[in-house]
Amino acid sequence: MKIIGFNIEEIHARKSFDFKRSAISTDILFTNIEKAKLDVLKDDEALKISFKFMVGYKDGEKKDSQDKNEVLIQGSILLMVSKDESKEFLKSWKNKEIPKDKALGLYNIILKKCSVKALQLEDEINLSPHIPFPQIRNQQQN
């Protein structure tokens, strides 16, 4: 399995209330797997794996509210796989699953690419970052 493409297809960010750092959640959902046609591949096959990367902000005071602070990034990963790997992916997807031995690498590339984009959006609309930043502190002298 080799990643040959990563595409962001939709970006959405919304701030509808001032957030008081109650809970921030990050989630990745795989939404579809399908064969992709690439003429340059001779012995291998290409798969397009669609995903959603979501950052949600919950305010403890606003239970069941329609107000939401969120960042949503939808995209796809293009994989070059062997014919056997392709069959394995498509068979697993019938149960809406990704093969366990392949999922970790896919999650990591999505986190790497989308977290950077989400941090930029959070900064632009003044949401708390979903990842803590390192901070420099004064050293205490004895």
Residue ranges and their predicted role:
Residues 111, 115-117:
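Helix-rich interaction surfaces within compact, conserved domain-sized segments
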Residues 118-122:
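Amphipathic alpha-helical interface segments used for dimerization/assembly
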